[in-house]
A protein has these predicted regions:
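Catalytic and substrate-binding clefts that recognize carbohydrates or anionic sugar/phosphate headgroups
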Residues: 30-242, 263, 269-274, 571, ...
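Catalytic core of carbohydrate-active enzymes
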Residues: 421, 441-448, 461, 470-478, ...
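Conserved, mostly hydrophobic/aromatic
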Residues: 40, 175, 250, 272, ...
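Aromatic- and carboxylate-enriched substrate-binding clefts and catalytic-loop regions
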Residues: 129, 144, 151-153, 278-536, ...
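Generic recognition of flexible, low-complexity loop/linker segments
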Residues: 161-164, 171-173, 237-239, 270-272, ...
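N-terminal structural segment of carbohydrate-active enzymes
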Residues: 141, 240-285
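Glycine-rich, histidine-containing beta strand-loop boundary motifs that form or position
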Residues: 47, 56, 93, 105-107, ...
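Secretory targeting and sorting signals
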Residues: 1-24
């Protein structure tokens, strides 16, 4: 619909094809009336000390903190003037640094663009600060750093991310949303600093002359999500195959960590097959290489990799390898890559490779900004495929490091795109790549970062997967089932419950065998009770039963970006009981997952409105209430089919057969 802005001497009102009368407000107020696709909102600029507040339907839904706009050495203060530049409201303010601050707001029907800059100041830090009390709960942003809690909601805990960046290994996204259906999208290709604590949210951009953002104002969180996806793009495809949505990827990391060899890997794969635990791929993780960056097998531990690949293929599975873009200084390839200019340069000295410390030593990084470097690296990967029958790769790496210099005019965000484009040419085998910051359109599988082998690890991994999905990456999986943080292996109960929870997600990512594993802290073998394998296999079979339903959800995600694993409040926007519930989610429109993620054999389950069929008891439960102490013995993972939802009859058939 054609829209235009109508102005009056006293105010600014967004109108449709008919000019709406302007309210008797000052130029510092903006009123956007309700429309067929937007709830309308009112925005006011605080002139005593530069800041903004947003209201919808008479309720305040967003407000900046008292020090709303800060920069290197100063904070914006009193507003000197407010004017209009076409559709844009322009506020000029003083600052404690004696420099002018210019705020520009351009209203649109369901959002407004907000940017501000400081006169005469070079690029640096620009921060916008928000008051949490008026905006409800905060969500979004993706993963918090390893070793830190993943609060749910974010505002329920402390978030401190000084390296929130396009180059981060974490799945981070400059997008946040609230329980009052407001979204904040910070438009930057540069690293940020993000903090939520003490009743405020601090969103800081670095290396920037201007802070640029879009604020969505909607009537539901799902509408905010759709607005954001409209900006960054939906998945253009699903990188994962039907087989990868049906059974787990098996990766060697948590089973053996770095203590692997050809015989161990083959024994592990055969054990899984013998107990009936399905899988589509066996991947070698860390320590198959002769050295990090060599991209050649260690002949001592893998004397015949071609035979290993053939043996895995004979079991009906693909064979894959873990790889990174780090090239260790003591590797055979480092000198070659350095001498040919294939490594990212150091800041301030483009003749010297940047040296970084990562979890396996000190290394240079393949420069994806150099086409010759990319060709050399991918040529090595294709040689592994041709020589040994390797089918694909787990790319476990950063595409750039903020400690280094970018090539030419490239930004850290550009390196994300270069890495995504390069890896998209290979079979990622359901491990996907951890690419973010506006890379939703690739349709990659995204795995949550490494988690502890405990109940807390399970909960944290589910929270992270949920956060990634709510940022527009629908093809998600937890960390390896049972966790993978170089700790003692999971208990039988944690391992089984993790498998059950993962079975009610888009994909399953596995490592620890339910037959036996190795305690990396002692070197001793841990043998699980005999029924563990059956319980695990049952979870995998449950996931297989969802294959047809999931295929439909994948098609929907590609069509319009609809998340597959999603918060219940996306489909039930007025049920605020789910604002803080992290152990229930919807898998598509028809399946409510409520797995056990704590020790025990019963739990409380919150049901949304409607009728819900329990595939285990074959009873229909009435929604809009909480089922207290609902039975969940170890062989049962609670789930409910929403009667009348798209696909519900097929789900009932498949889950009860």
């Amino acid at each position: 619909m054609h829209r235009r802005l109508a102005y009056a001497a006293a105010g600014l009102v967004l109108a449709g094809t008919v000019v709406a009368p302007a309210a008797a407000d000052s130029l510092s107020s903006v009123s956007v009336p309700r429309g067929p696709d937007s709830p309308g909102y009112q925005l006011r600029i605080n002139t005593a000390r530069l800041g903004i507040s947003v209201s919808r339907g008479g309720e305040q839904v967003l407000r900046t903190a008292s020090d709303a706009f800060t920069f290197d050495g100063g904070v914006a203060t009193r507003v000197r003037s407010v004017s209009r530049d076409g559709a844009t409201v322009v506020a000029e303010a003083d600052s404690t640094a004696g420099r002018p601050v210019t705020l520009r707001i351009t209203p649109r029907p369901d959002r407004f663009d907000l940017s501000w800059s400081v006169g005469g100041l070079a690029a640096g830090q620009r921060a916008t600060h928000f008051d949490l009390a008026t905006s409800g709960y905060w969500y979004g942003g993706g993963e918090t750093s390893e070793g830190k809690a993943q609060p749910y909601p974010l505002s329920a805990g402390v978030v401190d991310e000084p390296e929130f960046s396009p180059a981060s290994y974490m799945m981070q996204e400059p997008y946040f949303f609230t329980s009052k259906s407001v979204g904040l999208y910070v438009r930057t290709a540069q690293p940020m600093k993000v903090a939520l604590a003490g009743g405020r949210a601090d969103l800081t951009v670095t290396n920037s002359a201007e802070y640029t953002s879009t604020v969505f104002v909607e009537s539901s969180r799902r509408a905010v999500y759709d607005d954001y996806i409209g900006e960054v793009g939906k998945p253009a495809k699903s990188d994962a195959t039907d087989a990868e949505f049906k059974s787990p990827l098996w990766n060697s990391w948590a089973q053996y960590y770095r203590d692997i060899d050809q015989d161990k890997v083959l024994s592990w794969a055969r054990d899984l097959k013998n107990v009936g635990v399905a899988g589509h791929t066996v991947q070698l993780d860390d320590k198959w290489e002769s050295n990090y960056g060599n991209l050649t097998f260690d002949a001592k531990t893998f004397p015949d990799p071609k035979k290993l690949a053939d043996d895995i293929h004979a079991m009906g599975q693909k064979f894959g390898l873990w790889t990174t873009f780090w090239v260790n200084l003591d590797s055979a390839n480092y000198a070659y890559a350095r001498d040919h200019g294939y490594l990212v340069h150091a800041k301030g000295n483009t003749s010297t490779p940047c040296t970084v410390t990562w979890w396996n030593g000190t290394a240079g990084i393949i420069d994806l900004g150099n086409p010759q470097a990319r060709d050399w690296y991918t040529g090595n990967l294709r040689k592994l495929m041709a020589d040994y029958g390797v089918d694909g790769f787990k790319f476990d790496t950063r595409f750039f490091d903020d400690r280094c210099a970018t090539t030419g005019s490239l930004t850290p965000q550009d390196y994300q795109k270069l890495g995504a484009d390069m890896t998209d040419a290979f079979d990622q085998q359901g491990a996907g790549i951890r690419t973010h910051w506006g890379n939703q359109h690739y349709g990659f599988v995204i795995r949550a970062v490494d988690a502890d082998t405990s109940w807390d690890g399970l909960r944290t991994s589910l929270r992270r997967a949920s956060a990634i999905s709510a940022d527009g990456y629908p093809f998600v999986e937890t960390d390896m089932i049972g966790g993978s943080n170089s700790m003692p292996p999971p208990t039988r109960e944690v391992l089984v419950r993790w498998a059950q929870a993962a079975s009610l997600m888009p994909l399953m990512y596995a490592s620890t065998s339910p037959v036996s594993t190795v305690d990396t802290t002692t070197g001793k073998t841990v043998v699980y009770p005999a029924d563990t394998a059956k319980l695990y296999a049952d979870a995998v079979q449950t996931h297989a039963k969802l294959a047809g339903y999931l295929k439909t959800q994948v098609q929907q995600a590609v069509a319009d970006g609809t998340p597959i694993m999603r918060p219940v409040y996306f489909d039930f926007p007025t049920d605020h009981r789910f604002d803080t519930i992290d152990d229930e989610w919807l898998l598509g429109p028809a399946l409510l997952a409520a797995p056990m993620i704590t020790a025990g054999t019963a739990r409380d389950i919150t049901l949304p409105a409607g009728l819900w069929f329990d595939p285990h008891t074959k009873r229909i439960e009435t929604g809009g209430r909480t089922l207290h102490n609902y039975p969940a013995p170890l062989d049962t993972s609670p789930m409910f089919v929403r009667v009348g939802a798209p696909g519900w009859t097929d789900l009932v058939r498949d889950l009860t057969r």
